Regions:
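Amphipathic hydrophobic-ligand
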Residues: 41-43
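General beta-strand recognition
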Residues: 25, 35, 49, 54-56, ...
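Intrinsically disordered, low-complexity acidic Ser/Thr-rich regulatory segments
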Residues: 1-37, 49
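Short strand-coil-strand connectors
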Residues: 13, 37, 51, 69, ...
Length: 97
């Protein structure tokens, strides 16, 4: 599975991010894999990881929350078509061909 940015928030990562690469950190700090320069995003906001061929999103105690399909989540399985929202950025989970 991959992530695709759905809006024009200027972020420092490729438009397509492969979720099979292990854990991916998301946040405002420069040491994140997906750096989001948005004041509504915590320094270390969330992470996405794969375990036994399933991918998960996990909030890391962020102030403003991590949303999956419009609902605030702490930890949840990801499926193709899901939409993750972190700050003002929306990312769509897609299935690789």
């Amino acid at each position: 599975m991959s992530l695709n940015a759905m809006n024009s928030c200027e972020i420092e990562f490729e438009r397509n991010v492969n979720l099979q690469a292990g854990a991916i950190s998301i946040g405002r700090a420069s040491d994140n894999d997906l750096r989001i320069p948005d004041q509504t995003v915590s320094a270390h906001h969330a992470r996405i990881f794969t375990y036994l061929e399933a991918s998960f999103i996990e909030d890391l105690g962020s102030t403003n929350g991590t949303y999956l399909n419009g609902k605030r989540v702490q930890k949840h399985t990801l499926h193709p078509g899901d939409v993750i929202q972190v700050g003002r950025l929306e990312l769509k989970v897609t299935k690789d061909n």
